[in-house]
Amino acid sequence: MDQADPREIQTLQMYLNEYGQQIELMTQQLSMIEQQRLEGTAAIETLRALQENADGAVLLPIGGGAYLRVKVLDAGHVLVNIGADVSVERATADAVGYLEDRITELEALAKKVAGSVEQLQGQATEISRRLEAAYRGARQAQAGQGGSS
């Protein structure tokens, strides 16, 4: 790149900023997906432990680090949110299967989003390299003009 075009530098900078924003959004998405996966795993562990617990007593968090010891009336059935704030009653074993399927879907989604993040990072690196070359060209052109005056 002999002569650096200011418009090209500006365009590259704009692309780099956009890629950075997209990477940030996708990274946040990955965090939310991971949080949902962890919640699903915890729910499965809780349901399994409840099936093994003879007296049906559990600790119910009520906030502020406080818990109530409560008895579960029907450990054989669970209300499961299936989306759009709709919950359905399922047998505990069916609920566990549903949650396991949801976790599998979340893991596949996380893998897809992580791949997109990796691809965007590669593109951002390439743009950053081109931008650095354009800046170098601009400095060299400026140094050449300054020496000829």
UniProtKB/Swiss-Prot annotation:
Subcellular location: Cytoplasm
Organism taxonomic ancestry: Archaea, Methanobacteriati, Methanobacteriota, Stenosarchaea group, Methanomicrobia
Protein name stated in the entry: Prefoldin subunit alpha
An example Gene Ontology molecular-function term: unfolded protein binding
CDD domains assigned: Prefoldin_alpha_GimC (cd23160)
Gene3D superfamilies in alphabetical order: 1.10.287.370
Main function: Molecular chaperone capable of stabilizing a range of proteins. Seems to fulfill an ATP-independent, HSP70-like function in archaeal de novo protein folding.
Gene name, Swiss-Prot/TrEMBL: pfdA
GO biological process, alphabetically ordered: protein folding
Keyword Kinase (UniProt): no
UniProt record similarity statement: Belongs to the prefoldin alpha subunit family.
GO CC terms: cytoplasm; prefoldin complex
InterPro entries noted in UniProt: PFD_alpha_archaea, Prefoldin, Prefoldin_subunit_alpha
This protein's UniProt keywords: Chaperone, Cytoplasm
NCBIfam families on file: prefoldin subunit alpha
